[in-house]
Amino acid sequence: VLSIPHSCQALNVTTNAKKTMTKIFTLIICFGIMQTTFGQMTTEKEKSLQTVLDKTVDNKKVFGTSFAFKKDTLIWQGSAGNMTIDQPYFIASTTKLFTTAIILKLRAEGKLSLDDKISKYIDKSILSELHIYKEKDYSQELTIKHLLSHTSGLPDYFQGKGTSGKSLENEITEGNDQFWTFEQAIERTKKMTPLFAPGTKGKANYSDANFQLLGKIIETITHKTYAENCNEFIIQPLGLTKTYLYQDLTDKIPKKLYYKSNELNIPKAMTSFGADGGMVSTSTDMLIFIEAFFTGKLFPSTYIDELQEWNNIFFPMQSGIGIHLFKLPWIFNPTGAVPYFIGHSGLSGALAYFSPKENIFIVGTVNQVSHPDISFKTMIKLTQQLKKK
């Protein structure tokens, strides 16, 4: 029996990440006594899981949610509010798992090494003065691994403040939808100050510029677009039916995002994210994807251990190589009843994670930009219900 005192803990957390947790959020975890047991899904168990989603939708912060998980041969899917199980939604920075998978596939094919300098693939004009820290130019020292692990020291073009004093995130959530190109994202990055020299021990800084560069590297090596690479390496092999890179401004298929109580209509921005956050998917498709990612169906499974080289990035998350670690601190999880998860999440409230300890794959979204933290609470509550006897 895994027991935790009946208490409700509140933890104020400040983050720098664009698509995981922004600003200051309160992570509230209410623990009760639970037992670890898995077996056949009962009607009562299904109802308890559905109740978690029903209660998540309050029509104030969350208007719709969709989640799915797999434990061994047990699969459950549910939705609530204005979303259905098969409703496509923006997965935001969870897209980075797609980018990571493609990079690792290219590595397996011998087309790149994680230690390659990115100058091998990126034009000099793009790299020129990209990373100047304490009057030294480190631009030519950046490697693919630095980008994947957010240890490049590059600032975040999306969440960092520009010359206007506002971040792109601020501008977009205030209603100023806008386009940007890869080149513009990098130019914006150059106008900001790097945080540390590439590969500084114990240092990591979440930056979408890293994955903009990785997307360009993928296109340079393959001579194909990022979307074409996603189709070739991931979507077609896995038989995903509702997963694609958002590129068409007139595409109304994905569920509109919410920012606080209002719909957030930002098609221009969503077509601009690309390799750092532009994918659309469903919980059904994402469950297939996250299992494939961690079981060797997309790249050699032996790579997974290598990816787990953790650096603190924003509490309670840690950054590995292309993946994140979500692990509650001991004070809030003294018996380890809530397992750690590895995967990724996004500002939209989307996430895709795997619990190695429990062999649980879980994906979903709360589709709320102002409260992406709620998706983590939902993930924890679903896991608790699944583990209750």
List each model region and its residues:
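Short N-terminal segments immediately surrounding and downstream of signal-peptide cleavage
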Residues: 41-58
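Short, surface-exposed loop or secondary-structure junction motifs
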Residues: 130-342
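Short, gly/Ser/Thr-rich active-site loops of penicillin-recognizing serine hydrolases
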Residues: 328, 370-389
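Residue-level preference for non-acidic, small/hydrophobic
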Residues: 53, 67, 72, 96-99, ...
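Short, surface-exposed beta-strand/loop micro-motifs that present aromatic residues
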Residues: 340-343, 348-361
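Bacterial Sec-dependent N-terminal signal peptides
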Residues: 1-44
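Short active-site loop at a secondary-structure junction
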Residues: 59-64, 81-146, 197-207, 274-277, ...
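A short, well-structured edge-of-sheet supersecondary motif
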Residues: 53-84, 88-90, 179, 323-325, ...
